[in-house]
Amino acid sequence: MKRVTLAIIVFTFVALAAALPAAAQPGAPPCGIAGTWIGQVGDTPLMATYANVVGVVAGTSNLDLYGDPTLGSPYFSAATRNTSGRGVWTRVDRRTYDYMFVAVGLAADNSVLYQLKVWGTKTLGPHCGTMEVTATLDIFAPWQNPLGDEPPAYGSIPGLSGTAKRMPF
């Protein structure tokens, strides 16, 4: 009978420990960025999904951008939409990640007007449910390689920031 009681007690403790969020456990692994996040950077609302590719140290991202495709500039007044952003992220420390993604600004006829390279850092909050974001927006001409060494033909917008919340399970 003692063994059965002991087994029930041990099982109960294991079940309770498994139910606790990882961030609440002492010595727990760092927060992970994988999941879906909703937020805003600057004036642009966004929804982002991050997937782990190399364990929890690097992965891919897919971002839907809901902002003004003209970027507030008369130079891009023909822009009617942006593509989704596609990119990568890598862990810097327990709660901080570097990221970069590329999106394209399109006219009504689907011609490319500009390419965006957005890069910065994401820092997760203490309970892994919020994220502080910094961003620099580089605006490249359609003929440029946004991953190359050439400076962006249309300039950069540094110092953007925002927040996001993790979509709960």
Label the predicted regions:
Residues 1-8:
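Bacterial N-terminal signal peptides that target proteins for export
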Residues 8-18:
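Bacterial N-terminal signal peptides
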Residues 17-26:
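Boundary at the C-terminal end of the N-terminal hydrophobic targeting segment
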Residues 29-44, 85-87:
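Tryptophan-anchored aromatic micro-motifs
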Residues 45-96, 104-107, 130:
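N-terminal glycine/threonine-rich, aromatic-flanked beta-hairpin/loop signature
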Residues 47-52, 84-90, 115-126, 161-164:
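Hydrophobic/aromatic beta-strand elements that line small-molecule binding cavities or substrate pockets
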Residues 97-138:
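Acidic, glycine-rich flexible loop segments
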Residues 137-169:
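Edge beta-strand at a domain terminus
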